[in-house]
């Protein structure tokens, strides 16, 4: 199993191992082998699961149930490997449902709270992917995940903070979750990440704040009081920030301006959103830019005037012609 684990780090080998029946053998070892065999088998399955077809095959061989059990009850090394495997497997929609059905959310939240360093990051990563589904967002919150993820975003390693910010971003697409994140002190943590974090952390935090403001308008007061306007405004103009990072901060500011008559999204924000209309869709950001612009145009007369001034009408007319 240890040899297969190493071989499975190569793309061609992943295909060959699966073709030779290796998935079934490794799942069997992960379930019934010695402690060392289980560890190596789970490590091999984690590497194999990078391949989409292998990910499906692992689930078909009942590997998800085995991996959830090891993530819950295994040795520290087994838990580490199992968390990584579940993170890779969760990229598949059917696997997401199977992980949840096997009790994976409770196990992953527990690992994110109590695990060792690598376990926490992998568990938070798996939760981030699972949280792309609204039912799963609700289940993660019900399992106590919000408090756990806020703690990781505040006190974790850089990798843990990045994964936690991404998970909070997805969880915040749900109204009740956004309210819960705010109540648990998440706004302050997210603003701190948007100000001082890595590129990935800043982007995840800015999107999380934007989602909260959009779906739970009552959270905007907390963002303003915690200094979020200055932090997000700075991020839209930060020299070292990526275009995407600037864009998500701009979207958050537009949503904020739509909820507070005394706030206005700067022309820089609107220009960032308008520039996205000329680019191909990627990750939904073009759609989100359009939605934010339309919301701004109808939120107040002052916002509508600004929207006209920076060319919003012409840009959306061009977009309408393109999609007609």
Predicted features by range, described:
Residues 29-31, 70-73, 111-113, 152-154, ...:
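Short loop/turn motifs that cap or connect beta-strands within the blades
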Residues 25-27, 45, 66-68, 107-109, ...:
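Buried hydrophobic core positions in alpha-solenoid tandem helical repeats
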Residues 220:
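Solvent-exposed, well-ordered loop and adjacent helix/strand elements within mature globular domains
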């Amino acid at each position: 199993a240890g040899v297969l684990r190493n071989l499975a780090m190569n793309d061609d080998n992943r295909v060959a191992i699966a073709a030779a029946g290796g998935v079934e053998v490794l799942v069997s070892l992960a379930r019934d082998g010695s402690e060392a065999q289980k560890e190596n088998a789970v490590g091999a399955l984690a590497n194999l699961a990078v391949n989409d077809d292998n990910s499906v095959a692992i689930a078909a061989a009942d590997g998800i149930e085995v991996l959830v059990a090891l993530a819950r009850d295994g040795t520290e090394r087994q838990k580490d490997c199992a968390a990584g495997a579940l993170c890779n497997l969760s990229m598949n929609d059917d696997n997401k449902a199977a992980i949840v059905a096997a009790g994976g959310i409770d196990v992953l939240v527990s690992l994110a709270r109590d695990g060792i360093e690598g376990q926490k990051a992998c568990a938070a990563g798996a939760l981030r992917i699972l949280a792309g589904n609204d039912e799963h967002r609700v289940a993660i919150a019900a399992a106590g995940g919000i408090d756990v993820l806020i703690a990781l975003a505040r006190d974790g390693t850089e990798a843990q903070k990045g994964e936690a910010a991404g998970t909070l971003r997805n969880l915040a697409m749900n109204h009740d979750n956004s309210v819960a994140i705010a109540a648990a002190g998440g706004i302050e943590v997210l603003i701190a990440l948007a100000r001082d974090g890595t590129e990935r952390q800043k982007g995840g935090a800015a999107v999380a704040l934007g989602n909260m403001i959009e779906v739970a308008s009552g959270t905007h007061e907390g963002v303003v009081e915690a200094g979020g306007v200055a932090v997000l405004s700075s991020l839209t103009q930060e020299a070292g920030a990526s275009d995407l990072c600037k864009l998500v901060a701009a979207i958050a500011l537009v949503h904020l301006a739509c909820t507070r008559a005394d706030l206005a999204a700067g022309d820089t924000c609107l220009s960032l959103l308008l520039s996205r209309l000329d680019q191909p869709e990627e990750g939904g950001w073009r759609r989100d830019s359009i939605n934010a612009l339309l919301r701004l145009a109808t939120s107040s007369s002052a916002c509508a005037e600004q929207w006209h001034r920076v060319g919003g009408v012409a840009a959306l007319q061009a977009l309408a012609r393109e999609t007609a």
